[in-house]
Amino acid sequence: MTINLIAVGKLEKDFQKLFDEYAKRIFVFSKFNLIEIKENTLKNLEVKKEKETLEILSKIPKNSTVFLLSIKGKNYSSEEFSKLITNDANITFVIGGSNGVIESYFENKISFSKLTFPHQLFRVILIEQIYRAFTIKNNLKYHK
């Protein structure tokens, strides 16, 4: 199994430390790849969003089930999320840039909340939930 995360931008040092800790834990269950897309500096937000979206699409591995993280996506419980992501051989999660992505390119959308989260923090939340999903599937004590 391989989990891929494609995200626009780089993490700051403190968030990176937390992210790396969960990435290390995930390697027990699955390969994990992080693909960071450089944030585009164009002033025109629609052009910026389009360029970032096309860059993301070009990085998605073949035969991968893709989930865009979006406020418009479907909500899952931790148990449902575990079933969703641990039954596929190759999964890619996408976190767009600060101006979003062109969502029509993405069939599957997941929402963790109707709230808006800072991108730095959300990347850590996502990887923690991926780790939690594996602990649920493997009946480990982490999830209560």
Curated annotation (Swiss-Prot):
Entry's Gene Ontology cellular component terms: cytoplasm
GO MF: rRNA (pseudouridine-N3-)-methyltransferase activity
EC top class, as a word: transferase
Enzyme Commission (EC) number: 2.1.1.177
Location relative to the cell: Cytoplasm
The reaction(s) this protein catalyses: pseudouridine(1915) in 23S rRNA + S-adenosyl-L-methionine = N(3)-methylpseudouridine(1915) in 23S rRNA + S-adenosyl-L-homocysteine + H(+)
Keyword Methyltransferase annotated: yes
One Pfam assignment: SPOUT_MTase
UniProt: S-adenosyl-L-methionine binding residues: 68, 96, 112-117
Swiss-Prot/TrEMBL keywords: Cytoplasm, Methyltransferase, rRNA processing, S-adenosyl-L-methionine, Transferase
Record protein name field: Ribosomal RNA large subunit methyltransferase H
